[in-house]
Amino acid sequence: MNDFPWLTIIVVFPISAGSLMLFLPHRGNKVNKWYTICICILELLLTTYAFCYNFKMDDPLIQLSEDYKWIDFFDFYWRMGIDGLSIGTILLTGFITTLATLAAFPVTRDSRFFHFLMLAMYSGQIGSFSSRDLLLFFIMWELELIPVYLLLSMWGGKKRLYSATKFILYTAGSSIFLLIGVLGISLYGSNEPTLNLELLANKSYPVTLEILFYIGFLIAFAVKSPIIPLHTWLPDTHGEAHYSTCMLLAGILLKMGAYGLVRINMELLPHAHSMFSPWLLVVGTIQIIYAASTSPGQRNLKKRIAYSSVSHMGFIIIGISSITDPGLNGAILQIISHGFIGAALFFLAGTSYDRIRLVYLDEMGGMAISIPKIFTMFTILSMASLALPGMSGFIAEFIVFFGIITSQKYFLISKIFIIFVMAIGMILTPIYLLSMLRQMFYGYKLINIKNFSFFDSGPRELFLSISILLPIIGIGIYPDFVLSLASDKVESILSNYFYG
């Protein structure tokens, strides 16, 4: 066990520091904003320092582990630890949350509570990624939902209450299946509950019971990922939420579902995952085509980007269901890659809305001359989303392709068919992204607002855009940095399977 409680401090610090903000003056909007940014930067630096000096890349076992008895009556432990699977998502969470707080500068109504909720969400997300106890994972999973619901219901568009209610119904409803799975898997085979993930990974179950557990966890994670047909909350939520909240949703929240699929379904229930993986492969392939073909029909800019997220998550599902070293590594790389790209696109959509106050693409047009910096960044990041070589999306999708090709689980004819359908999805992606750029920035100037003058991207927006663009290009040029973090853990997970 680690001598110093690094992870406990990293998890508790944001929400504790955020609670102090509630005692700051009511009219101190700037104070609240800068205080929150300082907390996020300090948290990110603390996380980076702890990982740089304590994390060993060649060790697939749990590191920085902490194990404290929390509630004696329930025999409940506070177990924390990280490995190659969680370190990338934790660093991504810190980076995106810091930029999202900077993006939230225009928020003035109840800004103190808004920023507190962002910090509470930060703690819940890091807690989920670093939990080594199944019940603690569930508690952190639920803790993170409360601030998200409040952020969605209090700040956003006219239909924000509808979208927030839809979000909480989907996520809270699926959490019932998660809780049943947690209780079932921990109580099976012993009088005392076993909630330690390391012990549960070595446990075996009857086939029927393992399938039931797998389905319960799958429903919970499929809603968050999202996997079709449980995705319908996502476009509505993104369409109404404030763009800083959208950055957190696209950059981190969706990745929690994919993380859960690998951490619990794939690692704890390998036999059931082996049985369900062909179905997941089919669903992931359909998801790419469905979302890519639905996206061009969306008038709302943020809904179009939301459907692109659904399409890109399909590659993660395919990588996970390939049960190969390249496939799973590609899925993890896509989790990180899309975290940056999705957050960047929603930020740029939000900054565009701040200037023109329009969300419908058919009402826009000819903005390239008026806002050239935003146009340039939007174009570059759209290219990243359609997997342009040299960007992180390209290498992630290429590795997933390679994972399917090398998979020993599937017949050659089925692999050829899956790759063919995936290729069609990749062809459809430029269609909806390039048509989005054309409707926004090219053609005649359709915006007809009296006494309205555009102002281009300021230093804050430019700094944010470049900050997200740099890791996208960096990962695209040198993906080994991200792949090396998880490679040993991936091998450890796949050792439970008989092919790979």
UniProtKB/Swiss-Prot annotation:
It is an enzyme of class 7 (translocase). It catalyses: a plastoquinone + NADH + (n+1) H(+)(in) = a plastoquinol + NAD(+) + n H(+)(out); a plastoquinone + NADPH + (n+1) H(+)(in) = a plastoquinol + NADP(+) + n H(+)(out). The keyword Protein biosynthesis does not apply. GO terms for cellular component: chloroplast thylakoid membrane. Its EC number is 7.1.1.-. It is found in: Plastid, Chloroplast thylakoid membrane. The chain crosses the membrane at residues 4-24, 35-55, 87-107, 113-130, 134-154, 167-187, 211-231, 242-262, 272-292, 305-325, 330-350, 386-406, 416-436, 462-482. Keywords: Chloroplast, Membrane, NAD, NADP, Plastid, Plastoquinone, Quinone, Thylakoid, Translocase, Transmembrane, Transmembrane helix. Its main location: plastid. Belongs to the complex I subunit 4 family. This is NAD(P)H-quinone oxidoreductase chain 4, chloroplastic. The gene is ndhD.
